């Protein structure tokens, strides 16, 4: 019988605002090869300005061009270029306390989206496999930000269930929907779905379908 999945946590502190870390070797160093017996690993991070490059993108770029790819994003979205995100006094989604601490990092959010960074990726757990964790806002106001990433080593993955959720959209061809809005109730539906699945370790994969 295969052992249960193993979850490990790694805390990172960047030295530069834009920084790339190869995570597989970092986890091996920090946790003394605890993951060695697991054939696959799932890496995830809850940050919105730091995430992972997809495995297929790393393969297309090649290890030698990952840094150039990140630098290109930095040039496309320069810091402090008047992004609406950074005009904190106009943002109705923030209260006074949040405005006092909210970083002006609109460029990092745009680079995350345009660069195809992911909050969660899976990789074979083998020598030579490259896992790229990219921090796009590692230093803010001269202070390094602390990032927490997790890895789950596992032997196999199976689909526990599927559910279809309805998201109302406007008639305009371009729309933005906050999936966390309580009025939609999506998170509550997902929580009930997870509870019914009764899975100890798993992930939710959300995708859009055209109706």
Question: Which residue stretches match the model-derived regions?
Answer:
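A phosphate-binding glycine/aspartate-rich beta-alpha loop in the early core of alpha/beta enzymes
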Residues: 66, 70-86
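Short HxH-centered metal-ligating active-site micro-motif
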Residues: 40-54, 79, 83, 96-101
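Mid-chain, well-packed structural core segment of small domains
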Residues: 80-125
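C-terminal edge-of-domain segments
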Residues: 126-138, 142-155
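Mature, structured domains of secreted/extracytosolic soluble proteins
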Residues: 1-42, 48-57, 62, 66-69, ...
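Acidic, glycine-enriched active-site microenvironments
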Residues: 163, 170-172, 200-206
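Intrinsic-disorder/low-complexity signal
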Residues: 147-148, 155, 159-160, 180-187
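Conserved small/polar residues in nucleotide/adenosyl-binding loops
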Residues: 209-211
């Amino acid at each position: 019988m295969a052992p249960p999945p193993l979850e490990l946590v790694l805390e990172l502190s960047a030295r530069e605002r834009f920084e790339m870390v190869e995570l597989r070797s970092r986890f091996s160093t920090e946790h003394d090869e605890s993951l060695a017996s697991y054939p696959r690993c799932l890496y995830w991070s809850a940050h919105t300005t730091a995430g992972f490059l997809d495995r297929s993108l790393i393969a297309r770029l090649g290890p030698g061009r990952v840094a150039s790819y990140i630098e290109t994003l930095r040039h496309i979205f320069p810091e402090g270029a008047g992004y609406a995100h950074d005009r904190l006094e106009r943002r109705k989604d923030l209260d006074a306390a949040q405005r006092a601490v909210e970083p002006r990092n609109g460029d990092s959010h745009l680079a995350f989206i345009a660069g195809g960074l992911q909050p969660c990726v899976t990789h074979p757990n083998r020598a030579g496999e490259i896992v790229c964790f990219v921090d796009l806002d590692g230093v803010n106001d001269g202070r390094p930000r602390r990032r927490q990433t997790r890895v789950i080593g596992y032997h196999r993955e199976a689909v526990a269930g599927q559910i279809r959720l309805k998201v109302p959209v406007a008639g305009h061809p371009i729309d933005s929907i906050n999936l966390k809005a309580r009025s939609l109730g999506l998170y509550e539906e997902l929580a009930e779905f997870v509870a019914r699945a009764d899975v100890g370790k798993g992930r939710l994969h959300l995708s859009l379908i055209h109706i």
